Amino acid sequence: MTTLHFSGFPRVGAFRELKFAQEKYWRKEISEQELLAVAKDLREKNWKHQVAANADFVAVGDFTFYDHILDLQVATGAIPARFGFDSQNLSLEQFFQLARGNKDQFAIEMTKWFDTNYHYLVPEFHADTEFKANAKHYVQQLQEAQALGLKAKPTVVGPLTFLWVGKEKGAVEFDRLSLLPKLLPVYVEILTALVEAGAEWIQIDEPALAVDLPKEWVEAYKDVYATLSKVSAKILLSTYFGSVAEHAALLKALPVDGLHIDLVRAPEQLDAFADYDKVLSAGVIDGRNIWRANLNKVLETVEPLQAKLGDRLWISSSCSLLHTPFDLSVEEKLKANKPDLYSWLAFTLQKTQELRVLKAALNEGRDSVAEELAASQAAADSRANSSEIHRADVAKRLADLPANADQRKSPFADRIKAQQAWLNLPLLPTTNIGSFPQTTEIRQARSAFKKGELSAADYEAAMKKEIALVVEEQEKLDLDVLVHGEAERNDMVEYFGELLSGFAFTQYGWVQSYGSRCVKPPIIFGDVSRPEAMTVAWSTYAQSLTKRPMKGMLTGPVTILQWSFVRNDIPRSTVCKQIALALNDEVLDLEKAGIKVIQIDEPAIREGLPLKRADWDAYLNWAGESFRLSSAGCEDSTQIHTHMCYSEFNDILPAIAAMDADVITIETSRSDMELLTAFGEFQYPNDIGPGVYDIHSPRVPTEAEVEHLLRKAIEVVPVERLWVNPDCGLKTRGWKETLEQLQVMMNVTRKLRAELAK
């Protein structure tokens, strides 16, 4: 009989219950016990959904109050020593301080989890890091599930992936792989504690196997799993996000009891494991996208597998369902307005049912689920033949693009002269990245407007009032290039998606980005175009309030692509170029309206990189072309900015330079300007604004901290090409700390300008 299991589930709840409870706890509106009760209820509900799908195991250990890699830092005693906390007796309050910072310490650095839109907290490893086991997080969840009479499979990120996703810190140079001999016994203790608590199977996640690992890291898998296999539980080694076929010989030889492979991202890798002689878990339902599977096609893959493997075949989603929204059935508006599109979708709960149908078809025959299979086929056929998806005018515009359509009129050296002639900026010009605090009043006005409780005129007046406040406060602070604050925008991608054709939206399609932050990605289901101007009215209103230059603010094509659920029937590169041309219409309209500084945000450029380096060039070529297409045709005097965050650029700097933005602002404060060194060594040719303080924390930096970062920047970037700005947009901050943080930034800038003028 085929076994059905789950790798992981969304944590936040169908209606973001965890987010709201966390934020109430942080505001001291509920007690720790009340927060714990919400979490316990969510875990139980998740397990019940897995049971309802006829799962043989429920997943435990996947739930977290913030991030599963932070949980692992606590479980291994690898929390940063700079906090002075005891990992063996860490309070929930201290756990949150690790993630969010406190008055004495900045938060742990955050970056993207492989090529997803989820952020994890980056482990800080020092040459003298000591590890200490604390399995409480995993054991408690296992016992909770057992108390409900459930058969549970704990899931833990493996030791090599844990080291791989961390960073070396401290003055002493070392290779973090050298910490493995100290880390491994701690893993043995954690797994042993789970065995003693009754775990039969333990899933160990090693997504690092899907990237280009150095040879010594690959070799280390032999010793690691030889050691871990001595623990008396069965180990399911789980890989995902890409192919591990190149490691097939190694993986077949490892003394583990089962292997999970991602057959959605890399279906071709199945051939490499055709002769695998243990449990093979086939990840056949997409854990990262929202399209309904054609179950008949999936069965064409798994039925021959079952014939060969028998009871050794397990089925699951490709990866944790963390990356998908919770439940399609609550999307009543989408069902009413776009019934065809609704029928093509599957969220987490629908995916669990797809797996239930597959299990039944395999174990009891296709006839036992004939109705469900027919419905799946009908949805696939409807989507393949829909006229809602393909538009001849969009296809023609792309096909008719002339050669060099993506190039600016002149090189940067000429453009910057034309720009400075009218901008007349001082040394170390200051700006903001874009958004200002989204207050309760803003959110209430937007909600009331969407519900029809507030008229369009009243909504516009409310937003204009907020824009006027943002402009006034920036002028008081004496910033050089202003932003309008984006009060009218719910989300930097959703806002544009709502105004572009080919996009659709959900009401409750939230996925976790980090901690309590959730995003509701748009669905790109069809060809993309721009019916009318999207930002011109707001930007020109803001410009009318000030003599200082006002930045137009757009989200770039690659980021819109990366942060959406993208159609999977045409290449992503084609979708991206469609978005770029729609944005180009907006850029040229802004320019016509007198907005001559325009920022095209591309925070997601790096996360779009394929996991295998061999595939990078193709991606970077079409991503760069898409960015340039979005700003093509501008006058030399129009200054194009871009912003990138959560990123490491060292290995893609030529591609970043080839985007040819006049000014790039980047997130650097949490990494102590580490990123900037690469820009200096590469001699990045255009202007650059490294973030001088971390906006992800409410903490107000000291002037000494900001000065330290700015001086580091001056050492690396020629001062005439250096801008000063926060790390990122200020949407999630409160007004009080925002103004205090910006005041510190301005005080330091003035001090250094005076010094440089001498």
From Swiss-Prot:
Xref: Pfam families: Meth_synt_1, Meth_synt_2
Positions with a binding annotation for 5-methyltetrahydropteroyltri-L-glutamate: 16-19, 112, 517-518, 563, 607
GO molecular function: 5-methyltetrahydropteroyltriglutamate-homocysteine S-methyltransferase activity; zinc ion binding
EC number(s) from the headed UniProt entry: 2.1.1.14
Record family assignment: Belongs to the vitamin-B12 independent methionine synthase family.
Keywords, in A-Z order: Amino-acid biosynthesis, Metal-binding, Methionine biosynthesis, Methyltransferase, Repeat, Transferase, Zinc
InterPro entries: Cbl-indep_Met_Synth_N (IPR013215), Cobalamin-indep_Met_synthase (IPR006276), Met_Synth_C/arc (IPR002629), UROD/MetE-like_sf (IPR038071)
Cofactor, how bound (note): Binds 1 zinc ion per subunit.
Binding of L-homocysteine, residues: 433-435, 486, 601
Disulfide pattern: none
Active-site residue numbers: 696 (proton donor)
EC supergroup of this enzyme: transferase
Record-linked SUPFAM superfamilies: UROD/MetE-like
Leftover remarks: Present in outer membrane vesicle formulations which are used as vaccines in human.
Biological processes, Gene Ontology terms: methionine biosynthetic process; methylation
Name of the gene encoding the protein in the UniProt record: metE
Pathway: Amino-acid biosynthesis; L-methionine biosynthesis via de novo pathway; L-methionine from L-homocysteine (MetE route): step 1/1
Task of the protein: Catalyzes the transfer of a methyl group from 5-methyltetrahydrofolate to homocysteine resulting in methionine formation.
Listed name of the protein: 5-methyltetrahydropteroyltriglutamate--homocysteine methyltransferase
Binding site for L-methionine: 433-435, 486, 601
Cofactor names: Zn(2+)
Binding-site residues for Zn(2+), renumbered to this chain: 643, 645, 667, 728
Keyword Amino-acid biosynthesis in record: yes
Reactions accelerated catalytically: 5-methyltetrahydropteroyltri-L-glutamate + L-homocysteine = tetrahydropteroyltri-L-glutamate + L-methionine
PANTHER family: 5-METHYLTETRAHYDROPTEROYLTRIGLUTAMATE--HOMOCYSTEINE METHYLTRANSFERASE
